[in-house]
Swiss-Prot record:
Belongs to the metallo-dependent hydrolases superfamily. HutI family. Catalyzes the hydrolytic cleavage of the carbon-nitrogen bond in imidazolone-5-propanoate to yield N-formimidoyl-L-glutamate. It is the third step in the universal histidine degradation pathway. It catalyses: 4-imidazolone-5-propanoate + H2O = N-formimidoyl-L-glutamate. N-formimidoyl-L-glutamate binds at Y136, N304, G306. This is Imidazolonepropionase. 4-imidazolone-5-propanoate binds at R78, Y136, H163, Q229, S307. The keyword Hydrolase applies. NCBIfam families: hutI (TIGR01224). Zn(2+) binds at H69, H71, H226, D302. Binds 1 zinc or iron ion per subunit. Its EC number is 3.5.2.7.
Length: 392
């Protein structure tokens, strides 16, 4: 059994009840890691012996970020589309087809290189758990290989065959839904933990969304969905009704939507993706409204080549505080424990005995600096499963 002690921690965010406030903060603390798990958390003056030691030098230590919404399997980029939006063209989601064409044409090695590059990029910024969706293949073999490549770097894989109706089915959306619920789901399910649907105008309506999610649940996949990004719609309430783990975007909400999420009691998380609003110059979700209603909120990057090409959870924290009226403490919780809740995980997003030893050491004395110093590389060191991964 190997052991590692991280000591001289000035501020330890545990996300557990034993510490102070909603982040369970402990001062002058230490963490013992054994065989990839947190074995002990306690005061720095009484640390247990360990084989190795990392001196945090009085800095803040946090659980690794849990990015519960990302699209990392794709080819090409859409920089020209971004420039056009910044010049005033509206975002409608149609650029997804551009990425579908490039992804279908790419080799496995080309897609693998992109996935690994973005996964490494995220890890260097403190993300130790990332959900990865398919959705840029939209054929049985392309969706299956997307999930297979995603599974090489993450245990959280999501089948998003219902990202958009591809061009070859434009006049036959019912036939495409049949393909998604039939051969595509059968091929994808062994490689996925979740099923997702883009429930928006121009993509999939409520009836199609219900049919696809219900088929996925019958195949043993957990449900989650994109909802209410481009305008008000049925997605949020449908997600709550079907017991989805998370409804994502939540930009345009009615009072009934908020009430439904609050009534879910945390079983359905509202995952907010401020990188998308930043990159599309769109109105941000009202996180304050959700939090004040008692809704469980997560933050994620929505990393994708079209509407949110960022892998940075610290950037999303800063946006959430500046643009969505979250406090720094709320944003950090949403980016760690909130993301874990959106994935229905209890082994990540916290630093408590038995949890996975995923943590980051900041080049800062407090978690507040993640929002206070936007754009600054504050992640000094990352541990994943108790193993030091990178030291920028």
């Amino acid at each position: 059994m190997s052991s590692l002690l991280v000591d001289n921690i000035g501020e330890l965010v545990t996300n557990a009840g034993a510490g102070d406030g909603p982040l369970g903060i402990r001062r002058n603390a230490a963490v013992l890691v054994e065989d990839g798990l947190v074995a002990w958390v306690g005061p720095n003056r009484y640390p247990p012996p360990a084989d190795r030691r990392i001196d945090a030098e009085g800095a803040a230590v946090l659980p690794g970020f849990v990015d519960s919404h990302a699209h990392l399997v794709f080819a090409g980029d859409r920089a020209a589309e971004f420039a056009a939006r910044m010049a005033g063209e509206p975002y409608t989601g149609g650029g997804i087809r551009t990425t579908v064409g490039a992804t279908r044409a790419a080799t496995d090695d080309e897609l693998r290189a992109t996935v690994r590059r973005l996964r490494g990029e995220a890890l260097r910024q403190g993300t130790t758990t990332v959900e990865i969706k398919s959705g840029y293949g939209l054929t049985v073999p392309d969706e299956t290989r997307s999930l297979r490549l995603a599974a090489e770097v993450s245990e959280e894989t999501t089948f998003l065959g219902a990202h958009l109706v591809p061009a070859e089915y434009a006049d036959r959306p019912d036939d495409y839904v049949g393909l998604v619920c039939g051969p595509m789901l059968a091929a994808a399910a062994p490689h996925a933990r979740w099923i997702d649907v883009f429930c928006e105008r121009g993509a999939f309506d409520a009836d199609h969304t219900r049919a696809i999610l219900t088929c996925g649940q019958a195949a043993g996949l957990g449900a989650r969905l994109h909802a209410n990004q481009l305008g008000p719609g049925p997605g949020v309430q449908l997600g709550v009704e079907l017991g989805a783990a998370s409804v994502d975007h939540c930009t345009h909400l009615t009072d009934a939507d908020v009430d439904a999420l609050a009534g879910a009691g945390g079983a359905t998380v509202a995952t907010l993706l401020p990188g998308a609003e930043f990159s599309t110059r769109s109105p941000y979700p009202d996180a304050r409204r959700l939090l004040d209603a008692g809704v469980t909120v997560a933050l994620a990057t929505d990393c994708n080549p079209g509407s949110s090409y960022t892998s940075s959870m610290p950037f999303c924290i800063a946006l959430a505080v500046r643009e969505m009226r979250m406090s720094p403490t709320e944003a950090v919780w949403a980016a760690t424990a909130g993301g874990a809740a959106a994935l229905r995980r209890t082994d990540v997003g916290q630093l408590t005995p038995g949890a996975r030893a995923d943590l980051m050491i900041l080049d800062a004395p407090s978690h507040l600096h993640l929002a206070y110093r936007p754009g600054v590389p504050l992640i000094r060191q990352v541990l994943h499963n108790g193993v030091p991964q990178c030291r920028p």
